[in-house]
């Protein structure tokens, strides 16, 4: 179906990996949309209307029907616009893609955040080890494939934009070595291929202001020790 700017909206914030997932999917599908930037310190009535349960972004609105949660949104986009498929057609491969995408959210996003934004050294060490373990699983899963989706990127790659783009920012700020080419050569090579893909590169947020924002947050936390 043809989509216009009037019937597709995305409520989000610049710099969110979860919002970025949706933007990559929309770019891949060639869907035009209106981006409504939110201020999470002063949430809009529109956000509260469209996502009263979690009150967070991203929220995707298609013909006034709101959908929340980034991976759910990406699947909806894939089912609605059939070109450039994001999920495999094979049921087993599709189930695996969902498994690894959820694995990234469950085992990596939280552990990385706790590795960086904590004042408890034991907690930091624990989460660094959990991050290493989780990334190793993905390294093994990727093997000799160009993308997790094969020759073209898919759901797992989109979910893993957090690894490719956000982890390098976080580890530089905190002086950690969470994700390096030496420790995870296969995954690191994938990250460069993925970030340089035009459908991804064109929707990534500007790195410098994002780095400055998270550095200020990290320094504020460190000062509170």
Swiss-Prot record:
GO CC aspect terms: cytoplasm
Induction: By heat shock and auxin; by heavy metals like cadmium, silver and copper.
Alphabetical keyword list: Stress response, Transferase
GST C-terminal domain ranges (all copies): 90-214
EC number(s) stated in the UniProt entry for this protein: 2.5.1.18
Keyword check for DNA repair: no
Alphabetical list of InterPro entries matching this protein: Glutathione-S-Trfase_C-like, Glutathione-S-Trfase_C_sf, Glutathione_S-Trfase_N, GST_C, GST_C_Tau, Omega/Tau-like, Thioredoxin-like_sf
Catalysed reaction, written as an equation: RX + glutathione = an S-substituted glutathione + a halide anion + H(+)
Pfam family, one: GST_N
Function field: May play a role in the cellular response to stress.
Protein name: Probable glutathione S-transferase
Organism in which the protein naturally occurs: Glycine max (Soybean)
């Amino acid at each position: 179906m043809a989509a216009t700017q009037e019937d597709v909206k995305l409520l989000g914030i610049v710099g969110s990996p979860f919002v970025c997932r949706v933007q990559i999917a929309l770019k891949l599908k060639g869907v035009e949309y209106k981006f409504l930037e939110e201020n999470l310190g002063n949430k809009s009535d529109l956000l509260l209307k469209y996502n009263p349960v979690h009150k967070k972004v991203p929220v995707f609105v298609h013909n006034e029907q709101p959908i929340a949660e980034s991976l759910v949104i990406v699947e909806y986009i894939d089912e609605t616009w059939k070109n450039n498929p994001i999920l495999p057609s094979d049921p087993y491969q599709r189930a695996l893609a969902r498994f690894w995408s959820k694995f990234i959210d469950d085992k990596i996003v939280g552990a990385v955040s706790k590795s960086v934004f904590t004042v408890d050294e034991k907690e930091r060490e624990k989460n660094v080890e959990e991050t290493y373990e989780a990334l190793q699983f993905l390294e093994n899963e990727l093997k000799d494939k160009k993308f997790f989706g094969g020759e073209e990127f898919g759901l797992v790659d989109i979910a893993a934009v957090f690894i490719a783009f956000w982890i390098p920012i976080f580890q530089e700020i905190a002086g950690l070595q969470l994700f390096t080419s030496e420790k995870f050569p296969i995954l690191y090579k994938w990250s460069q291929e993925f970030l340089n893909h035009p459908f991804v590169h064109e929707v990534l947020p500007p790195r410098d202001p994002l780095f400055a924002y998270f550095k200020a947050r990290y320094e504020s936390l460190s000062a509170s020790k």
